[in-house]
Amino acid sequence: GDVYKRQHLHGELLKACSVHDLNTTYDISPENPDLHIGDKDPHGVQLRPFIVWFGEAVPMIAPAIRLVEDCDIFVVIGTSLNVYPAAGLLNYVRHGQPIYLIDPKEVKAYRNDIRFIRKGASEGVKELKELLLQNH
């Protein structure tokens, strides 16, 4: 099985979906990532970025909750922990499971068991890897 599980809660920049079907996605080329009015899916429906905009529902929240409830280590990268429902995922981490938050800015958290790595994503993930290799 997949040891490393992740959930793209707010979508993916290199995917598109139709404005009528957010569940069927299409890969976007990294060399030509722009979407334009008139770009359509195979059914002739306008494509949009596969991204959750502010005010839209977060369709992947239920699968994310299931992953969090079952995780051994919970890692959050780049967040203020102020935007819900995503910020509420911390409520589903089992007691005693390690929580790491990688963000260069100071983040006010309502839990005292979060281990902060105050770096950008690339450097923070490298540091997390070293910490995990030392402790596990």
Residue spans for each PLM region:
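Short cysteine-rich clusters marking metal-coordination/redox-active sites
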Residues: C17-D21, K40-D41
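Short Cys/His-rich local motifs and their 1-3 flanking residues in nucleic-acid-associated proteins
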Residues: L22-T24, H43-Q46, T79
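SIR2/sirtuin-family catalytic core signature
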Residues: A62-H136
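Short, small-residue-biased leader/transition segments that mark boundaries at the very start
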Residues: G1-Y4
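A general structural motif
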Residues: P30-H36, V52-P63, L81
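Catalytic cores of enzyme domains
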Residues: H10-E12
